[in-house]
Structure formats: structure tokens, C-alpha cells
Curated annotation (Swiss-Prot):
The keyword Membrane does not apply. InterPro entries: Ribosomal_bS16, Ribosomal_bS16_CS, Ribosomal_bS16_dom_sf. GO terms for cellular component: cytoplasm; small ribosomal subunit. This is Small ribosomal subunit protein bS16. The lineage of its organism: Bacteria, Pseudomonadati, Thermodesulfobacteriota, Desulfobacteria, Desulfobacterales. Keywords: Ribonucleoprotein, Ribosomal protein.
């Protein structure tokens, strides 16, 4: 089972709200997930980002790979000291 950290879309039409989730790579975008490790609201000014740093570190140490978008969100929040591997 390959595990990814990716965005799951929620909210209303034209008002997206995303959960940052740990999920099996074969699950649908908004489908079953293992754990919610953060939220991202791009509509708010400035964008609201809430991360569970310890859980993200745990999953990445366990082999979970962030998608390109999640990797950029984490990098902008100062989560990495070096560039991580991408899913």
C-alpha cells in the first residue's frame, strides 16, 4: 500500500476548503482516508493553513509522500529544511 499526503476537497461550489489527509494512493480524491493532518482554506485572505506537524513528520518518516501541491504548502510554512521527495 503506497501512502500519500494530499488534498481532499470540501466546501461549496466556488468556495473550496481542503483537508490535508493521509490516504492510500489508490483511494479517490475525496474518498476514504487514514488520518486528517491539516486544513487549507485558499478563499480566506490570507489563506488559512492549519497543520499537525508531529503527525505529518510521523507519516513522512513512515514512507508517506506528499503530492506536489501539499509539498509546496508545507515548504511555504517552513516545514522542510531541504526539498522532500515528491509522490
Amino acid at each position: 500500500m503506497a501512502v500519500k499526503i494530499r488534498l481532499a476537497r470540501h466546501g461549496a461550489k466556488k468556495r473550496p476548503f481542503y483537508r490535508i489527509v493521509v490516504t492510500d494512493s489508490e483511494s479517490p480524491r475525496d474518498g476514504r482516508f487514514i488520518e486528517i493532518v491539516g486544513t487549507y482554506n485558499p478563499v480566506a485572505e490570507p489563506a488559512q493553513i492549519d497543520l499537525k506537524d508531529e503527525r505529518i513528520k510521523h507519516w513522512m518518516e513512515s514512507g508517506a509522500l506528499p503530492t506536489h501541491t501539499v509539498r509546496n504548502i508545507l515548504k511555504n510554512q517552513g516545514f522542510f529544511s531541504e526539498a522532500p521527495q515528491e509522490a
